[in-house]
């Protein structure tokens, strides 16, 4: 029996490979944040960002598997070292929110291009990424709102750290 083979444009293959690279880069960024947080004594936040790092690898796997299922060889990306010059838990919370906004824009582009090409299978996967981004934006926005609402003194930051650990 012949293997299932489906046409997918070079543009969408490129975007799927880009998705892999961005998800793996996100994983490394969140790992760098987790390491910094742990080093600075924010053990709860470190656990949560470690969890985020693992989730991003799972998201990369979706794209790897999708391309493999279409009999397309995915590209394993070469990645630069992630940002690691963090200054505070607050800095990390805001950086996470901005990063998730960027990832959302990238997922929207994938969905828009898949729609333009009437590639509804790729659009379905892009929608899955966008559904995930709704959750990611809500999570990062929650922490931004906590800081904006309650402030940034040490007691509040310790409470946020503890709450992050509870959510890990």
Residue map of PLM features:
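Iron-associated oxidoreductase/ferritin-like identity signal
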Residues: 1-168
């Amino acid at each position: 029996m012949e293997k299932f083979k489906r046409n997918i444009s070079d543009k969408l293959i490129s975007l799927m490979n880009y998705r892999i690279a961005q998800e793996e880069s996100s994983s490394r960024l969140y790992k760098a944040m987790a390491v910094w947080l742990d080093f600075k004594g924010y053990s709860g936040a470190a656990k949560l960002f470690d969890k985020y790092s693992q989730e991003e690898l799972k998201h990369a796997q979706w794209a790897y598997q999708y391309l493999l299922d279409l009999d397309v060889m995915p590209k394993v990306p070469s990645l630069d070292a992630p940002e690691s010059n963090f200054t505070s838990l607050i800095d990390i919370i805001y950086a996470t929110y901005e990063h998730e906004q960027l990832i959302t824009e990238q997922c929207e582009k994938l969905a828009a291009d898949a729609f333009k090409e009437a590639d509804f299978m790729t659009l379905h996967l892009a929608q899955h990424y966008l559904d995930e981004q709704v959750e990611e934006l809500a999570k990062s926005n929650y922490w931004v709102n906590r800081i904006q609402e309650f402030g940034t003194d040490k007691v509040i930051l310790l409470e946020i750290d503890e709450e992050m650990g509870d959510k890990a």
